[in-house]
Design a protein with these regions (language model features):
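Flexible coil/turn residues that form the inter-helical turn or adjacent wing/linker of helix-turn-helix
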Residues: 2, 13, 42, 53
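Recognition helix of helix-turn-helix/homeodomain-like DNA-binding domains
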Residues: 26-39
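Short basic helix-loop element that most often maps to the first helix and adjoining turn
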Residues: 4-23
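Short, charged recognition helix plus adjacent turn
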Residues: 51, 61-67
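Short, conserved catalytic or interaction motifs in soluble domains
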Residues: 36, 55, 65
């Protein structure tokens, strides 16, 4: 399972789900579902989200048990 810190980073950057979704080219619901861990993001989506925040993917997404 992949855990994420999308919500934390959105708060740091003062971004609403709608704005992040617009920047990465998805619907707001997609961001909400990823934040809640309902679905794992595609590699492209994970990459684009990390790019918006200017951090490596592993700063936002972690594979549980990958220590």
């Amino acid at each position: 399972m992949i855990t994420n810190r999308i919500k934390e980073y959105r708060a740091r950057f003062d971004l609403k789900q709608e704005e992040l979704a617009r920047r990465v080219g998805v619907r707001r619901e997609t961001i909400g579902n990823r934040e809640k861990g309902r679905y794992n993001p595609s590699l492209v989506l994970a990459w684009n989200i990390a790019k918006v925040f200017g951090v490596p993917i592993e700063e936002i997404f972690t594979v549980e048990g990958d220590e």
